[in-house]
From Swiss-Prot:
This is Urease subunit beta. HAMAP family: Urease_beta (MF_01954). Its main location: cytoplasm. It catalyses: urea + 2 H2O + H(+) = hydrogencarbonate + 2 NH4(+). The gene is ureB. GO terms for biological process: urea catabolic process. Belongs to the urease beta subunit family. Pathway: Nitrogen metabolism; urea degradation; CO(2) and NH(3) from urea (urease route): step 1/1. It is found in: Cytoplasm. One of its GO terms (molecular function) is urease activity.
């Protein structure tokens, strides 16, 4: 390790203490079941309402939210598995494009997002 005046290329220094991810953002916990026959992996920044249609949960709770896990990580749901996950609200301009094409704009268009999910056979849509 280098002294305090120089940093060796590739070196990093870690501060003391814990890092709280998504500090100050609203969080909620939901139960999710994998009703499919294959494992499903969901990345840290995926708009949760748009995840694989074989995951069963209250899709309305997933609108405008993502997994509350460190950036670059993922949660894995094995077939038949049910587990609780914590979601946190999306930041930025709260617009989502692509993924499963349920949103393609503002996450505030909740009725339209749920209508598309229902039409496409997503589980967990009332």
């Amino acid at each position: 390790m280098s002294n305090n005046n120089y940093i060796v290329p590739g070196e990093y220094r870690v501060a003391e203490g814990e890092i709280e991810i998504n500090a100050g953002r609203e969080k909620t916990t939901i139960r999710v079941s994998n009703t499919g026959d294959r494992p499903i992996q969901v990345g840290s920044h995926i708009h949760f309402v748009e995840v694989n249609k074989e995951l069963l949960f209250d899709r309305a709770e997933g609108i405008g939210r993502r997994l509350n896990i460190p950036s670059g990580t993922a949660a894995r749901f094995e077939p038949g598995e049910e587990m609780e996950v914590e979601l946190t609200e999306l930041g930025g301009n709260r617009e989502v494009f692509g993924i499963s094409d349920l949103t393609n704009g503002s996450v505030d268009n909740k009725e339209l997002i749920l209508q598309r999910a229902k039409e496409l056979g997503y589980k967990g849509v009332e």
